[in-house]
Curated annotation (Swiss-Prot):
Biological role: Possible role in spermatogenesis.
Cellular component per GO, a single term: perinuclear region of cytoplasm
Keywords: Coiled coil, Cytoplasm, Developmental protein, Differentiation, Spermatogenesis
UniProt main location, coarse: cytoplasm
Stated name of the protein: Translin-associated factor X-interacting protein 1
Residue ranges, annotated region (Disordered): 1-37
Tissue expression: Specifically expressed in testes. Predominantly detected in the post-meiotic stages of germ cells.
Description of how the protein assembles with itself and partners: Interacts with TSNAX.
Pfam families given in the database record: TSNAXIP1_N
GO BP terms, alphabetized: cell differentiation; spermatogenesis
Keyword Cytoplasm appears in the UniProt entry: yes
Length: 704
C-alpha cells in the first residue's frame, strides 16, 4: 500500500505538467504542484536532518598502513576492508531520488514529438528538490538552473525560427532534384538523337565510300578502253595515210600515162606560137612604158608607211611635251610651297632661338647625375648600370625608385586603408599590416607565378579577387593581407619594371589582362616562327631571315618600324644581311623581370600604334570628346578606318566601348544601334584599356 501511494504521489504531477502547456499561468500551476509533490515525497529528508556523506565517510576506514605486500596480516586486513566497503549502502535520500527518477522515466510517453522535453521534466524536479533542500547553495543552484532555462528557451526560439528555413530547403532540394532529373532526361534524349544521327551519318559515309570505290573502278575501266581506242585510231590513221599515199601515186601514174597517150599536145602549130609571142612582146612594151611613167610621176612622193611612222612619232612627242608642261607646273607649285615652308621654318627657327635664349637665361643648369653615385646602394658601378641609355626624366624615376625602396625597407608596418568602397577589395583592412620586406627579385617571381596560374585557370574571376585568393593559397589566410599590401606598395613604386608596371595597371583596372596575355602570345608566336626557320636548331639565323620573319609576322608595321626592331637587335648600317643573330637571347629576362631592348621596342611600338589608331578613330568621328556617339556611328567609323575587320572583332570592340556583352551587340538592328550612345571620351578610354589594334590596312588590296 505504501508503494502504491508513493507511485500515485509521483505520477500525479507528471500528468498535470503535460496538460499545462507553456503559458505563464501553466508555469505557476506547475510550480505549485511541484511544491505539493515535494510534500508528498515519502521519508522526507532535509538539511536539518542527518544526510549521509556517502561514500566519503568511509574514507578514513579504508586507509591502509604500510605493510609488506606478501604478509598474511596485510592480506587479511585488505579482505576485511573490501568486505566492509561492500557492506556500505547508499544514503536513503539518494535512493529515493533515483527510484523516483526511474519511475518517472518509465511512465513517460516517448512516442510524441515533445518526448525530449518530457524526458527533461523529471530531471528538473530532481534539481528543484536539491535547490529546496540545500538552503546554503540555493542561490547558486537557482542561478545555474535559470541560466540553463534561459539558454534552452533561446535554443527553442532559434529552432522554431529555423523550421520555415528547413522546410524551404527541403522544397528547394526537391525542386533542384526535379530539375536535375529533367535535365538528365533531356540529355539522355539528346544523346539518343545524336547517336541515331551518328549511325545515319556512318551509314551514309559507308554508302558514299562504296559509290566512290565503284566509280574508281569504272574510271579505271574507262581509261583502259580509252587507251585501247586511242591505239586503234592511231593504227587506222597511219593506215589511212599510207593508203592516201598509194592512191596519189596511182593517180600520178594514170595522169602520166594519159598525157603520153594524148596526140597533139607536143605537136603545136608554129603559126599560133609566133602570133602568141608577138602579142606577148607588145604587152611587155606597154607595161614597161606605164612603169616608167609611174616612176616619173612618183619621184617626189613619200611612201605611206614612212608617213604613218612620222605621224606616230609626232604624236608621241606632243604627249611628252604636254606631260613635261604638267610636271613643270607641278614643280613650280611645289617650289612655291617650299618657299612658303622655308619662310615659316625661318620664322619658327627665330622663335625657337628666342625661346632657347629665354630658357637659357631663366632655366637652372643641367643636373650633375654623377653626384648620385655615392648615394645609391652599390656605388658608381650600379649607378652606371641604372643610368645607361636613360634621359633626365627617366633618371629622376630611377632615383625616386631607389629612394622609395630605402623608405619602404625602413617601414615595419603599413597603415590599413579601411573598408571604403573606393578601396580595392584586396586592401580592405583596418589596422596596421606587417611589411614582409621581400626583395625585388622575389616580387617579380611572385608576379610571374600569379600570371602563370591566371592564364592556366578555366573559370575566371575578377582579377583583384584572383590576386588575393592566390596570396591566400600561397601564404595562408593569416599572411595574405600582409603580402597584398607589401606587393601593392612595391609595384606602385617600381614603375620602370615592365612586369610590375603591367601588373599594377591590370590590378587597378587601367588595362585589361588580355593586353598582357596577347602580348605574351605574340612573343610566343614570333619565337615559334624563328624556330621554324632554324632547321638545324643552332639558335642563330641570318639578319635577312630575321627581317623576313618580322615582315611576315607583323604585316601592318611600316618599314621604319621594322628598321627600328632590326637596330634594337644590333643591326647597323655597316652590318650585312649575312651576319648571324642569336635570336633566343632576344626573349631573355634578367632576375628583376627586365626584358631585352627588342621586346621593349615591340611594346613601345604596340602602345604608339594603339594611340595612333584611337586618334584616327577620334578624327574620323569628328565629334567633341564630351558629345555622345551612337553605336551605329561608332560601328560605321570602325569599318571605315579598318575595312577588313571581321564581325567578331567588331563586336568585341563595341562591347568594350559600350560595356555590354559581346553576344548582345545588335550588329544587324540599326534602330537599336541608333539608341545606344556614350560619350566619345569615355568610349576611347575604354578602348585604350583593352587590346585594341588595327586588324588590316586602311585600304585593302583589290586582289584580296
Amino acid at each position: 500500500m505504501a508503494n502504491l501511494q508513493e507511485r500515485k504521489s509521483f505520477s500525479k504531477p507528471r500528468i498535470s505538467i503535460q496538460a499545462s502547456g507553456g503559458t505563464p499561468e501553466a508555469k505557476g500551476i506547475e510550480k505549485r504542484k511541484l511544491s505539493q509533490k515535494r510534500r508528498t515525497l515519502p521519508l522526507q529528508l532535509s538539511l536539518g536532518g542527518h544526510l549521509s556523506p556517502w561514500p566519503t565517510y568511509t574514507s578514513g576506514q579504508t586507509v591502509l598502513h604500510n605493510r609488506k605486500p606478501c604478509s598474511d596480516d596485510s592480506r587479511n586486513r585488505a579482505n576485511s576492508c573490501q568486505q566492509q566497503s561492500m557492506s556500505i549502502s547508499k544514503p536513503k535520500y539518494l535512493e529515493q531520488l533515483e527510484n523516483y527518477l526511474r519511475k518517472e522515466l518509465l511512465l513517460l510517453d516517448l512516442s510524441t514529438d515533445s518526448a525530449q522535453e518530457l524526458r527533461l521534466q523529471p530531471y528538473r524536479e530532481i534539481f528543484e528538490f536539491f535547490i529546496e533542500d540545500f538552503k546554503t547553495y540555493k542561490p547558486l543552484l537557482s542561478s545555474i538552473k535559470n541560466a540553463y532555462e534561459v539558454m534552452l528557451a533561446h535554443q527553442k526560439e532559434r529552432i522554431r525560427s529555423l523550421e520555415p528555413l528547413k522546410a524551404k530547403i527541403v522544397t528547394m532540394n526537391e525542386d533542384c532534384s526535379e530539375r536535375v532529373l529533367a535535365m538528365r532526361a533531356e540529355e539522355r534524349y539528346e544523346i539518343s538523337v545524336l547517336k541515331k544521327e551518328k549511325m545515319n551519318l556512318l551509314k551514309l559515309i559507308d554508302k558514299k565510300n562504296e559509290e566512290k570505290i565503284s566509280l574508281q573502278s569504272e574510271v579505271a575501266k574507262l581509261r583502259r578502253s580509252l587507251a585501247e581506242e586511242y591505239l586503234r585510231y592511231l593504227t587506222e590513221r597511219d593506215a589511212r595515210k599510207i593508203l592516201i599515199g598509194d592512191l596519189n601515186e596511182l593517180r600520178y601514174q594514170q595522169e602520166d600515162m594519159s598525157l603520153a597517150q594524148t596526140p597533139g599536145v607536143w605537136g603545136e602549130d608554129p603559126v599560133k606560137l609566133t602570133l602568141a609571142l608577138k602579142m606577148t612582146r607588145q604587152d611587155l612594151t606597154r607595161t614597161q612604158m606605164e612603169l616608167n611613167t609611174m616612176k616619173a610621176n612618183s619621184g617626189d612622193v613619200v611612201p605611206r608607211r614612212d608617213l604613218e611612222m612620222q605621224e606616230k612619232t609626232n604624236m608621241e612627242l606632243q604627249e611628252q611635251l604636254e606631260s613635261l608642261k604638267a610636271d613643270y607646273e607641278e614643280v613650280q607649285k611645289e617650289h612655291e610651297l617650299l618657299l612658303q615652308l622655308h619662310m615659316s621654318t625661318l620664322k619658327e627657327r627665330d622663335q625657337f632661338y628666342n625661346e632657347l635664349q629665354e630658357i637659357q637665361r631663366t632655366s637652372t643648369p643641367r643636373p650633375d647625375w654623377t653626384k648620385c653615385e655615392s648615394i645609391i646602394a652599390g656605388g658608381p658601378e650600379r649607378w652606371l648600370v641604372l643610368a645607361e641609355g636613360k634621359n633626365s626624366d627617366q633618371l629622376v624615376d630611377v632615383l625616386l625608385e631607389e629612394i622609395g625602396m630605402g623608405l619602404l625597407r625602413e617601414k615595419d608596418f603599413f597603415p590599413g586603408l579601411g573598408f571604403g568602397d573606393a578601396i580595392p577589395p584586396f586592401l580592405r583592412f583596418d589596422g596596421p599590416v606587417k611589411n614582409k620586406k621581400p626583395s625585388k627579385k622575389e616580387v617579380v617571381n611572385l608576379l610571374k607565378d600569379a600570371w602563370k596560374e591566371r592564364i592556366a585557370e578555366e573559370q575566371k574571376e575578377p582579377f583583384p579577387d584572383f590576386f588575393f585568393n592566390f596570396l591566400e593559397r600561397r601564404f595562408g589566410v593569416n599572411d595574405a593581407m600582409a603580402w597584398a599590401y607589401t606587393i601593392f606598395e612595391n609595384i606602385k613604386l617600381f614603375r620602370s619594371s615592365e612586369i610590375m608596371n603591367q601588373f599594377y595597371a591590370v590590378l587597378m583596372g587601367k588595362n585589361l589582362e588580355s593586353v598582357y596575355i596577347n602580348q605574351k602570345k605574340t612573343l610566343s608566336h614570333l619565337l615559334k616562327e624563328l624556330l621554324s626557320v632554324d632547321t638545324q636548331n643552332e639558335g642563330s639565323i641570318t639578319m635577312e631571315q630575321f627581317s623576313t620573319i618580322l615582315k611576315t609576322t607583323f604585316p601592318l608595321k611600316k618599314e621604319e618600324q621594322i628598321q627600328e626592331l632590326m637596330e634594337a637587335v644590333g643591326w647597323g648600317p655597316d652590318s650585312s644581311n649575312t651576319d648571324m643573330l642569336n635570336y633566343r637571347s632576344l626573349f631573355n629576362e634578367d632576375e628583376e623581370g627586365q626584358s631585352e631592348p627588342f621586346v621593349q621596342r615591340l611594346w613601345e611600338q604596340y602602345e604608339s600604334d594603339k594611340e595612333a589608331y584611337l586618334e584616327e578613330l577620334k578624327q574620323e568621328l569628328d565629334l567633341d570628346p564630351l558629345e555622345d556617339v551612337t553605336l551605329l556611328k561608332m560601328r560605321g567609323t570602325l569599318m571605315n578606318i579598318d575595312p577588313t575587320m571581321d564581325k567578331q572583332t567588331l563586336s568585341a570592340y563595341l562591347s568594350q566601348a559600350y560595356q555590354i556583352p559581346a553576344i548582345d551587340v545588335p550588329l544587324e538592328d540599326e534602330e537599336k544601334q541608333g539608341i545606344i550612345s556614350i560619350k566619345v571620351e569615355t568610349a576611347l578610354d575604354r578602348l585604350r584599356m583593352a587590346d585594341t589594334k588595327r586588324v588590316g590596312p586602311r585600304e585593302p588590296d583589290p586582289a584580296s
